Amino acid sequence: MKPHPTPGRASEQLTKEDCLEMFRQLYLARYFDVRLIKEKKRGRLRGTLYSSHNQEAIIVGSIFGLRPTDWISPVHRDMPMFFMKDMRAGWRNPDRMGMSIEEVCAQVWCKSGSPGRARDNWSHIGSLEKRIIHSTSMLAGTIPVAAGVVLADRLNGGDAVVLTFNGEGSTAQGIFHEAINYAAIHKLPVITVVENNQWAYGTPVQLEVPTEDVADRAKGYGIPGYIADGQDVFDVYDKVMEAVEYARSGKGPSIVECKTFRAYGHGDHDDDRAAKYRDPHEVEEGRLRDPLAICRRRLIEKSYLTADDAIRFMAEGKSSSEATTEDFPPEVVAYLDEGIRFALASPEPPAEEGGMWVFKESE
């Protein structure tokens, strides 16, 4: 990995409370993943799950420093991002600019009143009020939408930036070029975060990108390309905040490549161990650099965590089947449990709604 130099690291300005909050959010993202996988294996969930295991540092570090008025456009592996946006304002703060855990759990359980109206169990949702752009299955398809959103914001005198998240495979799509080219010409504050987990479903990165670093694509547009260690929440925070300041100052878009590794198959329908398209040794090596363990080590070095505190919760290094509730802080378990209880108690969608919300209803 060739790290991009970051003058004046933004993470050095974080308080002890900020750093510990990041640590808790990493655990929350991991527990969300662990719990949902367990629920699916018990037959309590429908649809497909896309695990964010091993990629939590990108979810937490990239949005931690955003303003409430900034926009995000998550991809399918970023499900916790929907309820983690603006979480620094308070996990239970009803006024924060992020979805509630109840809304997201209702979405996952396909319940009536969920953001997706039970049409989908995963990430094809959004909220204009909360400044979360609706996601799409079309690779790189949200980048031009993100460009349009911040163009409108700029025309209205705003100073918001947008983070649009994509896998490395999406950078091989034509719309990726068209959207970033347009954003570069008009200096739009679009930050394209590329979650390079080395695999686009079953296609390795070297068959998608001809260069060693995806961030090199930025050179063709005359914009910055940053490279972050996607396992280190503080490095992700630093690189994204540098891109945010660049964009907010009116200089335009950038690409932030977060190098990470996909812990499991593409989704729970893809048993890559049975398909054998990934080397088991490569998978084992990729899982060794757990973002929770890296953050824990950094906090101990800063004396923000004592030795006793550091061993209280040990979810890192454990697979979803191995981890238990005892491996997670009680406030994390309680928060997600509230959302799940709400979802389970919510009604199923009535059959008569099946034809609704397909087209815009007339006034």
Q: What do the predicted segments below correspond to?
A:
Residues M1-I58, F64, H266, D270-E363:
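Conserved acidic/glycine
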Residues I132-D337, A345:
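Glycine-rich ThDP/TPP pyrophosphate-binding loop and its adjacent helix/strand module
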Residues V34-I37, R44-H186, P204-P210, A215, ...:
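Cofactor-binding active-site loop characterized by glycine-rich and histidine/acidic residues
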Residues F82-M84, G202, H266, E353:
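Short acidic, gly/pro-rich beta-turn/loop elements at beta-sheet edges
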Residues K2, F23, G113-P115, N181, ...:
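Short acidic/polar alpha-helix capping motifs at helix-coil junctions
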Residues H76, C258-T260, V358:
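A general secondary-structure junction signal
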